[in-house]
UniProtKB/Swiss-Prot annotation:
It comes from the Bacteria. To M.tuberculosis RV2411c. This is Uncharacterized protein sll0335.
Amino acid sequence: MQLQSYDPGNFYDELFFAPGQPRPQAAPLIDWMGQLSPEILRQHHETAQIALFNLGVTFRVYNDDQGVERIFPVDIIPRIIAEAEWRSLEKGLKQRIKALNCFLTDIYGPQNIVKDGIVPLDIVESASGFLKPCIGIKPPAGVWCHITGTDLVRDGAGKWFVLEDNLRVPSGISYVLENRRVMKSTFPDMFQTIPIQPVDSYPSQLLETLLNLAPPHLAAPVVVVLTPGINNSAYFEHSFLAQQMGVELVEGRDLVVADGYLQMRTTKGLQRVDVVYRRLDDDFIDPEVFRPDSLLGVPGLMEVYRQGRVALANAPGTGVADDKVIYAYVPEMINYYLKEEPLLANVPTYLCWREEDRNYVLDHLAELVVKSANEAGGYGMLMGPSASPQERAQFAERIRHNPRNYIAQPVLNLSRVPTLIGDQVEGRHVDLRPYILNRGDEIYVHPGGLTRVALRKGSLVVNSSQGGGSKDTWVLQGSTQ
């Protein structure tokens, strides 16, 4: 097929140095796929989409007027990462999670990082994810962020950057597992000849992480996955993970606080619950503490949690670290808490609450990406170079009105991966979301992660809600380049 003649252009390409020159880790794949005709590859691609549909791999877009569930399309040309490069990323991700966990322990405790002038108090307290009811809480094993999805990008020079931290309720791991399942059934020969690290252990790794949180001296801790319900955009994933771990999927109405413990309603009566993997935002967890109008949570849950009678993952309050203004301080957190230099760099970031930064951003909106501090999914964002003058003017007014709520970053020349578009192979921009499990005494980074791809030509927005797709991510075993 056309992979041999694929032109990576003036971008860092994950599979090719130049036309006809694959990177060492990609050479076996390119040779193998080169034997397939465009028609056969297209058939395989369509088969993969049908398989995802039959598996029910869907997501729901909140602003979709029709409320239709959509398939998250997978492109069948994978992204490949050499083992040595992956080990380097692993080290940087573990370092970052350690520092963020120290930060959460600190700001809900002595707030030394504030007292020492590293992070301003008003920045912490004005973050929508900072929850005063969590001050003084000591989560099991001192771990706040048990499950994290960290978004990484690579620039035109091949350097990795952290784009975003997702600690509150990171999603997407189900796509990683189901994409691999579909790829293995579509191309079984490739998985027999190319040494690809497996990914199917994630549910057991997650269950082990959750069981480690249970109160001590319990012979058989009960774990549940708490979902907002079937209308949530990631409901497929909630159901999938519960089924894969062999635990109950519950909604708030299935749980009740009774006799000082969290209990689950069953056909045989109430059953004590010891660990909750919660997939709803902090505000909805407990109407007695947070939003009083929440019908999704459990009244009294936070009091049971404070008493150490149930564990919650992730811990309430972790959302403060998702704030994109807080993100800008993570390199300083690494210096402050770990006495180390960051192994993974942040994207250079302008903080609009600073007058000098704000003036620069307002003068250079056409060159920058502007992001709202607490929105996700590609929403609340301005792509300056492609925005209209009217859109830039509207964003400028928003920045002036609430500068604390906005950051800006240069437009990175994101790396690309060959992607099947119609009957042609074209380069498309990608990011990478690895998944990290923090058990306190051990941090586990799942091999690969979710590669999201911007399917629209020239687009840098990879989010599923904005028309993006995904790719299987191969971390090779024994590769050094």
